[in-house]
Amino acid sequence: TFVQITKTYDPEHHGDHHGKVAYGFPVPESVSADTEEEFITPIAVRLASANPALGPKNAAKCTTCHAFEKGGAVKLGPALWNIVGTDIAAAEGFAYSGALSGIEGAWTAEALDGFLLKPKAWAPGTKMGFAGLKDDEDRANLIAWMFQQADAPMAL
């Protein structure tokens, strides 16, 4: 593909230059996949329309390794009751990888969204074997539900 800009009108000069290329430059046919970023609607926007009632459906993928109920046991992964708002890598009874132990902050909606999208990209070296939950709405529904899985549920 080639983009060109032509001079179509010049009030001071008239002649045979109309329609001639004034400046041209090549444009790549496509952008390679490694330079193209996918836009993801911010989790705060998606949470506004999220349906927490659909969270358990998405959480079913997680229950092999995690318990969501109050008093749930540590399995291959930490129990997730009361996890929202707590420090990352701080759930009792679970030995976290250095990948998560080295991350400062709390499990916010933004942190959960990034981790659940691509755990190994968000926390390189994590022990979590799950590839990620790619659907943006599914992640929002799951996170909205996770906010409710607590002794004192946090506001979205």
Regions from the language model: what does each represent?
Residues G55, A59-E69, L142-M146:
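The canonical Cys-X-X-Cys-His
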Residues T1-E38, M154-L156:
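N-terminal export/targeting leaders of redox proteins
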Residues P56, K70-A109, G129-G132:
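Gly/Gly-Pro-rich "capping" loops immediately C-terminal to redox-active cysteine motifs
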Residues I43-S49, T63-A67, A95-Y96:
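N-terminal post-signal-peptidase region of extra-cytosolic proteins
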Residues T1-T6, D10, A106-L156:
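C-terminal capping alpha-helices of c-type cytochrome domains
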Residues F25-A59:
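Electrostatic cytochrome c docking/interface patches
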